[in-house]
Amino acid sequence: MMMAAEAQPPSLIEQLPPVRGRLSENVALSGITWFRVGGPAEVMFRPADCDDLADFLRQRPPEVPLTVIGVGSNLLVRDGGVPGLVLRLGRGFARITCRQQRIRVGAAALDANVALTAKLAGLSGLEFLSGIPGTIGGALRMNAGAYGREIKDVLVEAEAIDPQGQAHLLSPADLDFGYRRSGLPEDWIVTAAMLAGEPAEPETVAHRMAAIRQAREASQPVRSRTGGSTFRNPQGAQGPKAWELIDQAGCRGLRRGGAMVSEQHCNFLINTGRATAADLESLGEEVRRRVAAETGIELHWEIRRIGRHRELPT
């Protein structure tokens, strides 16, 4: 007598509600992150717009983990990939509009594009964004800053959606900004922000942006596979910089597999071509160990690390 085949449990994507955006399985994240390493997303969701995102969040299985990513500029995805859902905001969240001295930006808008739009509109104060890789959503999440300014200095209000699909309007005080951090709950998703500029001649703004670009190219490995600043400065804007401590500990040029501490700026890790995420993370941890042994100061990761480590063969 023939035995009936045992029914297979539904895959994750089969358990998810219908969307107007795009749901995809087994999406390679190594093609997204600037390090060009890492395993796949089990399922990636690219919502069409805020309504699509909110509807999805209200209906999704609550036990399924959700991870939000941007353009992958300050991100290390581990080699075993990311289980559950990976949410990536796309074109529906990248619009930038100006009205008087205010700029409304979607969370997926590139920081550099926001700075460029402000310049064309004759607004100053946002030039620093031209030197920050990534999106406005990520900039708000970590209070990104460069060249003497931070996102908190120009934020009027932010829009976010909580895990239940409820929209919220948040003031800078609500976000409780600190050095490279915000008080935004980890499971809330930034969807847009209103930023403030000041009237200025576009040529003046252009000169400032050019100076920032030149300074960045002179001091950072901008043409390498890197994730930006690896560690936060231990005392914020005060005290020794992370790169100074790394240099003091003799880590400039240190290698682990295909990963290397940049010779140009030693708070940057580089994928020299064949690095794994494990190489990069292991090298970062070795840098932390050597800095602590040399200086007594503990460095904390600024690069966000997500996913699981690759399982070793048995």
Predicted features along the sequence, with ranges:
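Anion-binding (especially nucleotide phosphate/pyrophosphate-binding) glycine-rich loop
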Residues: 4-136, 144-146
